[in-house]
Amino acid sequence: MSSESAIVASLKGQLSKFSGMISKGFKKPKKKLIKEMLYGIQASKDVKLSNIGRTLKENQPLIKTEDRLSRNLDDEDFTDSINEEICRLGASKITEDMVIAIDPGDLRKKYAKKMEFLGRVRDGSEREIGDGYPLCKAVATDIESKKVIPLYCEAYSFLAEGVKSENSQLLKMIDLIFEHTGDWGIHAIDRGGDRGVLYKKYLGEEKPKRFVIRLVDRDLRHQGRRRNCCDLAKALPTPYETVLIVYEEGEEKKRTVYYNAVPVKLPSYSHKLYLGVVKGFGIEPMMLLTSCLVERNRKESIWRMVEYYLARWKCDESYRYIKQCYNLEDVRVRSYISIRNIGVLVLAVSYFASVYLGQSIKLKMLVERIFIVSKRFFGVPSFFNYAIADGIFNLLYPDKTALRGIKQNSIEDFQLCFDFG
């Protein structure tokens, strides 16, 4: 057996084991579907059922395989179950001060006309309103490293039964994350998090949950007076400074930013909060509201709070990876259940590639070999997860046996893996 054949066999075995872990509550036909979809999405780097079907190498016409996949994706919604399992697995990797980025996103469908419950969404990348489905996403990351941990991804529609609002979907996701992570992790949210219902969730108990939220326009209480956050930010002196390396149009540039923090409260709550102000990113100051403890006389403590928010930008790269690497916005199924299922399956694929394969020394060696395959074909990419996806694609796509020959995992196969660093 050649070295690449051994890598492929090992990769298939790990994929089969991972599939069994996240589908343990389903019946046998659904377990088979989930394993085939996880394999096919990675082997084709695509979510179109025709391309997934080709990678399965079945001894029947492709249209038969495609029809079977379509039928099985449509008859049961397993979004909540797989999100639960991925969140459970990911929570064990989260440390006390990791950042958990909460993001209401979108799955844009520019040219779709007949997809079920197709609604209107705001396209964040193109800054326009168009057809598509809203997304709820959560990813965890560490400030000191490039490691990202996908936790949650759900596509939904306001036209579907049982969906009340974006707020209800966000709260559903946040509740699940709290259920598995407890008080560990700091929730970081962009401007979309500046809403009363989220402050109620984070500050509704005696001990506040830790968060960093970018403000838009809100009144705060400072020194007993009610003041607008924009006015307060403009008037606040920013004596501390740091130099950041930013990338604009492919070029590395230095940017000096100035920052400070001041204690504040929200008008309806008694909890002590801090308003962090950063000047230099744009014309207007960046305003961050946090419940994390900030030592105002230590610039490192203030900047740490800013770093919690800036780490969210690494999570944005992970979102782009999930969308672009597997062509999620090119999904071509009509039923609402199928769209939701494919969305959560792409989350599972990204977790497998970016987290599961690196959780033990033996698997880390497999990742290194996959990375070498990726470099040989593509060069070194800027984001490690792209390299792993490319490497897996190059190993699985030309394979002629697909999932045939992989033994069915039993419960004894799911041994505990301890990460010793």
Describe these PLM feature segments:
Residues T55-R68:
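Short, basic interhelical loop/turn and adjoining N-cap
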Residues M1-Y39, A43-D46, E85, M98, ...:
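Single, function-defining residue in the core of a domain
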Residues S44-R54:
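Short, charged amphipathic recognition helices of the HTH superfamily
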Residues L38, E66-S145, P263:
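Active-site-proximal, Lys/Arg-enriched surface segment
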Residues T55, N72, Q324-C325:
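Short acidic/histidine-centered micro-motifs embedded in hydrophobic/aromatic stretches
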Residues K35, L49-S50, E66-D67:
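Short amphipathic alpha-helical segments
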